[in-house]
Amino acid sequence: MAEVEETLKRLQSQKGVQGIIVVNTEGIPIKSTMDNPTTTQYASLMHSFILKARSTVRDIDPQNDLTFLRIRSKKNEIMVAPDKDYFLIVIQNPTE
C-alpha cells in the first residue's frame, strides 16, 4: 500500500494536477485527493463512461481492450488508466 501512496503523491505533485481518484470496478471511490461530493461525481460519471468506451473498443475488435482514456475540455483534462481491479482517474488543468 505504501507504493500506491507514493505513486499518488508523485502524481499529485505534478504541475496542473487538480485531483486523483482511484475507483473500484463497481464505480466506488477507494482513494481520492478531492472533496467527497466532487469525488462521488467524477467516480460515478467516469465509471459509466469508461465502461461504455471499453465496450465500444471491444465491439470494434473483440481481441482489443481499452488501455488509456484522455478527455480534454476547455477547463479540464481527465485521464483514466483502467485496470482489471480499479480505474485511476487524474484530473488536471491543461493550461498549466
Swiss-Prot record:
GO BP: microtubule-based movement; visual behavior
Coiled coil: none
GO cellular component, one term: cytoplasm
Keyword check for Cytoplasm: yes
Subcellular location: Cytoplasm, Cytoskeleton
Keywords: Acetylation, Cytoplasm, Cytoskeleton, Dynein, Microtubule, Motor protein, Transport
GO terms for MF: dynein intermediate chain binding; identical protein binding; microtubule motor activity
SUPFAM superfamilies reported for this sequence: Roadblock/LC7 domain
Annotated disulfide bonds: none
Modified residues annotated as N-acetylalanine in this record: A2
Superkingdom field: Eukaryota
Transmembrane segment boundaries: none
Entry's family note: Belongs to the GAMAD family.
Assembly mode: Homodimer. The cytoplasmic dynein 1 complex consists of two catalytic heavy chains (HCs) and a number of non-catalytic subunits presented by intermediate chains (ICs), light intermediate chains (LICs) and light chains (LCs); the composition seems to vary in respect to the IC, LIC and LC composition. The heavy chain homodimer serves as a scaffold for the probable homodimeric assembly of the respective non-catalytic subunits. The ICs and LICs bind directly to the HC dimer and the LCs assemble on the IC dimer. Interacts with DYNLRB2. Interacts with DYNC1I1 and DYNC1I2.
Purpose of the protein: Acts as one of several non-catalytic accessory components of the cytoplasmic dynein 1 complex that are thought to be involved in linking dynein to cargos and to adapter proteins that regulate dynein function. Cytoplasmic dynein 1 acts as a motor for the intracellular retrograde motility of vesicles and organelles along microtubules.
Protein name listed in UniProt: Dynein light chain roadblock-type 1
Species: Homo sapiens
Taxonomic lineage: Eukaryota, Metazoa, Chordata, Craniata, Vertebrata
Name of the gene this protein is made from: DYNLRB1
